[in-house]
């Protein structure tokens, strides 16, 4: 007989609450009537519904979700206790850090508190304000501040200081608490100076009215509480970012160095930017503006040719008239010519704008009307990825750059490059399909070279990522000398190829130094060799001497080839500055903090030569641009100046730091020589400042830099500078109509031998990772991520 089957029932497991009961939050609270009728209860006694209908309002079911009020009261009490404990600790630190009244500070001691201005000497943040460079000191300060309690912080302060949010007053209580901080509490990204006597006298701290905010005084340039940020806000308040390769990044570092040497000056305190709204223009027109009379049209097209097409190839001008201008003027309203009509309007807009600039008319209203007309027509067209789309966005890029909308311009440059890549302009085997049509083949290659040049110049000048990858473009002309080309090339095409090769080297410098966070000595030597080899293998027709003698340049009736040749040599000198900049800044900071030098003793001679190369390149670039301004510029009135003003400003900052730390004596020139170069830079920038807000602001900053250098010796005995070098290469070095062959040879020698051959052997040019990488102290503070 089988055993009876017994049914077993699984015992139900009780669900375990993941959150303890005392930490559960209230979801709802309702009386019995509202729960029964599923009405929304106000939770009061009596509730709204019961009061309205006269029911008895009772709460018989109480769960722990209804006890949130008691729990929150306990949490608030706990938070208040923590605040009192924190204030007590700060008070104890303040009492233990009282300084003897006889100690005086050697250098101003900044305190890094992120607080709000009370009485700013500069403009405050507003919609009509110029955008502000939130420029922070890359130089470490002796005594970083203790972080204020949350109750003392401005709730609207988000950590981005502008002149409108920089403090200028101090409370006696908070200032005392910031006098002495142990090393262990110093921020990670700071250079602790070992001079313990650099302490602030308590009696030197100004008192503050009790009714004002208790905020500590801000000294120097803010480092955003340990973050090294290049942050911009344009006139409308839109946020923009400038990266490590931009001149504003160099200015940011220079302000910190000047603060350490000179203290608070207008250079370190005036953080204004350019009053530009960097956004696309709105379309307000209902119909396009009429095309200008042919005679007026030809003037605008000529201005476009001089300012843009000579250096940044866009059109073959003969075909431009034949295929675009003539057809559009025959029947402007035909559906077959609307794409060409858009291109013509954009060309007229650029030409008209630069014509007004040459006449010192910064408004350029006619150019704005033509540009808006082109965009109005473009709005009704379909961008079909044809060649006209590449040209359309490339022309918009040039127009926005002319009115200083750099971020907006870069957006259109990106679109133009994407369309060009979709057409295969970056692939040699695709372009070779047009080999039977030689003109089309060369046009495609030259247009993509222009896009590449614009990418390398514009992206690097504002510190943005490069758009075109070198591995993705297989044009063989980038890696061969111009005289090795199969097809015969005119002078402008040769210059175009060499300009592309220089831009390739600039891209490699950026990739090797400013994308990585490690300086590689072997890569530095490799890039120095490549810069030297470029100069050594340059076609004699394109040599530096021809810039000084435009009459010897072929096909140069309108001086267009002089401009592109000038651009080649200026960018080569700027590439030397860019290559040398990390070493130059390292040497400048090492003067303040000698302990840093111990991290780089093995390659000290290389670093020294690169620093001198940065100074020499800056001097030569300014002299070369000054010669151009005094000669060719007055003849052609070319107002496109992005390369000139950026390199000029970059060079002036390098010379200012050179004067400040006294390294000019080792290089063989006097302070007076460098000051004259700074004055030349001021003259160059002033030529474009009327119609270019960027040049105007650069000019103001350069004046502040000169003023800070001149006034730094006030109250001190100025020691005369003695030049002990037997060969003073750059004294009385001047380019002019009577310049001798020695001056030209000096320039050519520098381009080929800016670093000694004893330190760099040509066999070191092989690729590969270096076995001697080194990391500068606080590298992230200067060249790392700045957000």
From Swiss-Prot:
Compartmental location: Nucleus
Keywords: Cell adhesion, Coiled coil, DNA-binding, Metal-binding, Nucleus, Transcription, Transcription regulation, Zinc
Record GO terms (molecular function): DNA-binding transcription factor activity, RNA polymerase II-specific; sequence-specific DNA binding; zinc ion binding
Biased composition (Polar residues): 209-221
A Pfam family per the record: Fungal_trans
GO cellular component: nucleus
Annotated segments matching region Disordered: 1-22, 120-140, 200-221
InterPro entries: AtrR-like, Transcription_factor_dom_fun, Zn2-C6_fun-type_DNA-bd_sf, Zn2Cys6_DnaBD
GO biological process, one term: filamentous growth of a population of unicellular organisms in response to biotic stimulus
UniProt feature coiled coil, ranges: 69-97
DNA-binding region(s) from the entry: 31-57
Gene induction: Induced during biofilm formation.
Function of the molecule: Transcription factor involved in yeast cell adherence to silicone substrate, filamentous growth, and biofilm formation.
Protein name per the record: Filamentous growth regulator 27
Species in which this protein is naturally found: Candida albicans (strain SC5314 / ATCC MYA-2876) (Yeast)
Gene: FGR27
């Amino acid at each position: 007989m089988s055993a009876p089957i017994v049914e077993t029932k699984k015992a139900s497991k009780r669900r375990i609450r993941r959150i303890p009961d005392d930490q559960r939050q209230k979801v709802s609270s309702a009386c019995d009537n509202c729960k029964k009728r599923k009405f929304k209860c106000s939770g009061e006694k009596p509730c709204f519904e019961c009061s309205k209908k006269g029911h008895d309002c009772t709460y018989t079911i109480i769960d722990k979700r209804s006890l949130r009020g008691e729990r929150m009261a306990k949490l608030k009490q706990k938070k208040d206790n923590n605040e009192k404990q924190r204030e007590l600790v700060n008070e104890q630190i303040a009492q233990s850090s009282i300084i003897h009244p006889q100690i005086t500070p050697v250098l101003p001691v900044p305190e890094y508190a992120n607080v709000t201005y009370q009485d700013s000497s500069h403009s405050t943040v507003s919609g009509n304000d110029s955008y502000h460079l939130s420029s922070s000191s890359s130089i470490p300060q002796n005594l970083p501040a203790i972080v204020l309690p949350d109750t003392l912080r401005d709730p609207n302060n988000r950590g981005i200081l502008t002149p409108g949010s920089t403090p200028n007053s101090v409370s006696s209580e908070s200032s005392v608490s910031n006098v002495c901080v142990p090393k262990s509490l110093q921020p990670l990204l700071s250079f602790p100076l070992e001079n313990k006597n650099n302490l602030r006298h308590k009696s030197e701290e100004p008192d503050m009215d009790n009714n004002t905010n208790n905020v500590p005084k801000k000294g120097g340039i803010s480092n955003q509480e340990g973050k090294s940020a290049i942050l911009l806000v344009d006139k409308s308040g839109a946020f923009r970012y400038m990266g490590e390769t931009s001149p504003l990044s160099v200015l940011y570092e220079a302000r910190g160095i000047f603060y350490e040497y000179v203290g608070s000056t207008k250079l370190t305190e005036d953080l204004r930017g350019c009053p530009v709204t960097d956004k696309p223009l709105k379309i307000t027109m209902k119909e396009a503006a009429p095309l200008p009379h042919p005679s007026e049209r030809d003037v605008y097209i000529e201005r476009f040719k001089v300012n843009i097409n000579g250096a940044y190839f866009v059109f073959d001008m003969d075909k431009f008239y034949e295929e675009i201008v003539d057809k559009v003027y025959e029947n402007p309203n035909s559906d077959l010519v609307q794409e060409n009509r858009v291109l013509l309007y954009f060309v007229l807009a650029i030409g008209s704008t630069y014509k007004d600039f040459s006449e010192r008319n910064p408004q350029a209203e006619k150019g704005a009307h033509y540009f808006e007309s082109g965009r109005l027509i473009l709005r009704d067209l379909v961008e079909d990825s044809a060649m006209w789309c590449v040209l359309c966005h490339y022309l918009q890029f040039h127009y926005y750059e002319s009115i200083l909308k750099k971020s907006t311009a870069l957006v259109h440059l990106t679109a133009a490059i994407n369309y060009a890549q979709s057409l295969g302009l970056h692939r040699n085997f695709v372009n070779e399909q047009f080999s039977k049509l030689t003109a089309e083949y060369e046009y495609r290659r030259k247009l993509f070279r222009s896009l590449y040049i614009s990418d390398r110049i514009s992206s690097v000048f504002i510190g943005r990522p490069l758009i075109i990858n070198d591995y993705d473009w297989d044009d063989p002309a980038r890696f061969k000398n111009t005289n090795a080309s199969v097809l015969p090339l005119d002078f402008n095409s040769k210059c175009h190829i060499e300009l592309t090769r220089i831009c390739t080297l600039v891209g490699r410098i950026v990739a090797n130094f400013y994308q990585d966070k490690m300086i590689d000595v072997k890569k530095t030597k490799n890039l120095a060799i490549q810069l030297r080899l470029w100069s050594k293998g340059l076609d004699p027709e394109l040599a530096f001497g021809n810039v000084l003698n435009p009459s010897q340049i072929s096909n140069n009736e309108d001086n267009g080839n002089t401009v592109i040749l000038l651009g080649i040599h200026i960018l080569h000198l700027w590439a030397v500055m860019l290559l040398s900049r990390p070493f130059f800044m390292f040497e400048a900071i090492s003067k303040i903090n000698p302990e840093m030098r111990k991290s780089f003793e093995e390659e000290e001679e290389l670093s020294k030569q690169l620093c001198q190369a940065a100074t020499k390149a800056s001097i030569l670039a300014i002299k070369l641009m000054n010669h151009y301004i005094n000669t060719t510029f007055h003849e052609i009135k070319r107002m496109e100046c992005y390369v000139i003003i950026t390199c000029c400003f970059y060079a002036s900052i390098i010379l200012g730091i050179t004067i400040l730390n006294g390294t000019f004596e080792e290089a063989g020139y006097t302070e007076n020589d460098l000051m004259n170069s700074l004055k030349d830079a001021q003259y160059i920038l002033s030529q474009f400042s009327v119609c270019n807000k960027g040049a105007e602001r650069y000019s103001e900053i350069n004046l502040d830099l000169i003023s800070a250098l001149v006034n730094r010796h006030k109250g001190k005995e100025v020691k005369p500078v003695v030049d002990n070098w037997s060969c003073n290469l750059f004294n009385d070095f001047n380019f002019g109509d009577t310049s001798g062959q020695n001056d030209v040879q000096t320039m050519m020698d520098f381009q080929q031998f800016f670093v000694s051959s004893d330190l760099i052997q040509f066999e070191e040019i092989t690729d590969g990772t270096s076995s001697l990488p080194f990391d500068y102290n606080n590298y992230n503070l200067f060249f790392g991520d700045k957000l």
